[in-house]
Amino acid sequence: ERSRGLGDVYKRQLLMLCVILAASLFAFTGCQGNVQNNGKINIVCTTYPQYNWIQNIIGEESEEFNLTLLVDGGADLHSYQPSAKDMAKISSADMFVYVGGSSDAWVFDAVRETVNKNMKKVNMMELLGDRAKEEEVVEGMQDDEHGHSHTASEDSHGEHEETDEIEYDEHIWLSVKNAEILVQKLTDVIKELDTDNAEEYQSNADAYIKQLSDLDKEYESVISAARLKTVVFGDRFPFRYLVDDYNLDYYAAFAGCSAETEASFKTVTFLAGKVDETGTKAILI
C-alpha cells in the first residue's frame, strides 16, 4: 500500500511538471491566445452544460472570449483525465468552471499550479450550496463493494457505517431549477470579468432563465397530469435532482456515481419485478 501511495505521489508530481512546462510553452509561443496577447477573456469549462450556459450568457459578445470545453461529448466524466495540453489551458484561464464532485478529484491539483493567479475558480457544487444532495442508495440498488442489492430493511436502518465520508451527487445540471440558480451565479462572475458589458450579460441571462423557468413549468404540468410517477432505471442513476424536483419515485441498478457498470442477475430481476409492480412500461437505460 505504501509503495502504491508513493507511486501516486510521483505520478501527480510528474503531471504537475508537464503542466508547468506546457504552460510556459504556450506563454512564450502565444499559441493559446490568452488574455495577455489577444485581449480576450479565457474561460475553460469541464462539461457541456456549463459551456452551453455561458454561450447563452455572453451572446453577441462571444468574440470577446475564448470559450473552451475540455470534456467532449460522449466522454465519460467519471473516468476523464486531462492531458498536459488541457492542464495548460486551465493554467492560463481567467475563469475555470468545474462541477466540484467526486469525478473532479484531478481539478484540485490543476488549480494549485495556475499561471494566472487572478483566475476565477468556479466550483458549481459550492455555488449550489444547500441544494447539493447526498448520494442516495434506494431499495434494490447494487452495492459497489459487496455486490448485493439493498433491501428495504437495510435502507431504512442505515446499514452503511456512520464514519463513511459523505459523497454528494454531482449531476447537478440535470435539474432545471438548479440550472436557473447556476446561470445567474455564472453571470455574476462573468460581469466581474467584463464590467463594460455587464448589462448585456445580465439581459442575456434573464432571457435564458425565463426559458428555463418556462421549461420547469412544462415539466410540472406534464408530471402532475401523469398517472405513473415511478421511474425504473437500468444503469447508474444521474437524475436524483430531477426526481426530487417533481416528487417522482425511482428504482435503479446503481447510484449516480457508482463504479459499477454490470448489473447482477439479482438486480436485473428486482428491477423487472418493479416494472410489473408499478405498471411502468419499460426499464430506462
Language model features: what each stretch is:
Residues 1, 22-23, 38:
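Compositionally biased, intrinsically disordered low-complexity segments
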Residues 6, 16-17, 38, 54:
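Low-complexity, intrinsically disordered short peptide segments enriched in small/polar/basic residues
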Residues 1-13:
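Single conserved hydrophobic/aromatic residue that forms the stacking wall/gate
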Residues 27-285:
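Extracytoplasmic metal-acquisition and chelation regions
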Residues 12-33:
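Sec-dependent N-terminal signal peptides of Gram-positive bacterial secreted proteins and lipoproteins
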